[in-house]
Each structure stands twice: as structure tokens, then as C-alpha cells.
């Protein structure tokens, strides 16, 4: 098992505890090494989860991402930490909301029941002020919908709105949710073929047009 570094904190002028930057760097390198060593994931879930209490948002973000990947592979071993992971959906830090969504999406792909209690809050973040969070919301939804598409039956309108998002990257990703659902539950999204067709012909971003065409193809191929 990986041995956590003995971390020292210092107090800044505001009385806040901050991590020594060199220690933070070493810990991040350690986590990056563990990320590549998938054979050690199962025995290190508890250790990585303990880092959710770390004072460094960079370390917490890395831990959240890793727990999502670990949870996809070992969902039965991540159950005790899902509540803590979901608590970051309310974080004041954009990055931590992103990573919480990413993690819950991967865990939910493996076992929807593990994240079901937090599904409503996940959906709320579709309207987050941060475009990166909205993007992560779509990614998480694609993961969950891969194996539990029925969870989205009453939420299609949310993704219709995201097709018109002001952020280019969000608009690029939004049609992908229609592609995922089109392969599994085309009846949920077939009524939006006309809108997707318009987007595929008129959106200013080439990737948006391509992804919209891909969504249309997926829907029509499975009706």
C-alpha cells in the first residue's frame, strides 16, 4: 500500500492552514504514480479517500478523480465514501464541483444505486454558473446513462437547453448525451431530431455540428 506523506501545514496571515507547496507537489506525484498502478487501486481506496480531508484543493481534486475511476472498477469498495464525494457538489470551488460530478458519474455508471440519493443535486448542477461544471455534468450524465438510461426519462429538457449553451465546449458535448440515449432509449429523444438537424447545419462550431449528426444517426439507427 502507498504510505501517505507526513504532511506539515503552516498558518498564513489570515489564520488559514495551508499545505507546504513542496509537500503538495510530492503528494501529487505520489497520486499520479498510483493512478497508473491500477493493480494497487483496490488496496488504496481507503488511503485516497482519506485525502478528501486534505487542505489542498489540488490534492482533493485529484483524490476525487481517482475515487471515481476506482469506483468504476470496484463499486462495492467505494460505497462508504460516496456521501463524502457527493458533499463536494456543494463546494464553493468550481474545480471540486467538477471533480465530484466526474466521480459520481463513473461510480453511477458501475452502480446507479450508489449515487441515486444524490441524483437530484447532480441534475441541479446543469445550471451551474461555471461552464466547466456544466461540462462535467454532461460527462457524468453520459456515464450514468450508459447503463441506466431510464434515470433520464424526465430530464431530457435539461439537455435540450444545453444544446444552446453559451459556452462552445458545453455545446460540443451536449449532443453526445442524445447519442448515448439514442442508442439505448431512442424514444426519449427522437422528438428532438429536428432541433439536432438544425444545429448540425447552422451551429458556428464544427464539432457541435459533427456531434449533432452523430446523435441523429444513433437515434435513427435504433428507432
Could you describe each region identified by the protein language model?
Residues 24-31, 46, 61-62, 97-101, ...:
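Alpha-solenoid HEAT/ARM repeat scaffold
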Residues 71-74, 108-111, 145, 178, ...:
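Alpha-solenoid repeat junctions
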Residues 39-51, 75-88, 112-125, 149-162, ...:
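Amphipathic alpha-helical scaffolding segments comprising HEAT/armadillo-like alpha-solenoid repeats
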Amino acid at each position: 500500500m502507498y504510505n501517505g506523506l507526513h504532511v506539515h501545514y503552516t498558518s498564513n496571515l489570515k489564520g488559514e492552514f495551508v499545505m507546504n507547496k513542496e509537500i503538495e507537489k510530492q503528494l501529487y506525484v505520489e497520486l499520479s504514480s498510483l493512478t497508473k498502478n491500477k493493480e494497487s487501486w483496490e488496496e488504496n481506496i481507503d488511503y485516497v479517500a482519506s485525502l478528501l480531508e486534505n487542505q489542498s484543493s489540488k490534492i482533493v481534486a485529484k483524490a476525487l478523480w481517482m475515487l471515481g475511476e476506482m469506483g468504476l472498477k470496484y463499486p462495492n469498495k467505494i460505497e462508504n465514501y460516496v456521501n463524502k464525494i457527493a458533499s463536494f457538489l456543494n463546494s464553493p470551488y468550481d474545480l471540486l464541483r467538477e471533480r465530484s460530478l466526474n466521480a459520481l458519474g463513473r461510480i453511477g455508471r458501475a452502480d446507479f444505486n450508489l449515487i441515486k440519493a444524490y441524483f437530484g443535486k447532480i441534475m441541479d448542477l446543469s445550471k451551474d454558473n461555471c461552464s466547466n461544471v456544466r461540462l462535467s455534468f454532461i460527462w457524468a450524465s453520459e456515464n450514468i446513462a450508459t447503463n441506466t438510461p431510464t434515470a433520464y426519462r424526465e430530464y431530457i429538457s435539461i439537455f435540450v437547453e444545453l444544446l444552446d449553451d453559451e459556452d462552445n465546449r458545453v455545446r460540443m458535448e451536449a449532443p453526445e448525451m442524445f447519442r448515448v440515449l439514442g442508442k439505448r432509449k431512442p424514444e426519449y429523444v427522437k422528438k428532438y431530431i429536428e432541433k439536432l438537424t438544425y444545429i448540425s447545419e447552422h451551429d458556428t462550431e464544427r464539432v457541435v455540428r459533427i456531434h449533432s449528426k452523430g446523435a441523429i444517426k444513433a437515434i435513427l439507427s435504433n428507432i
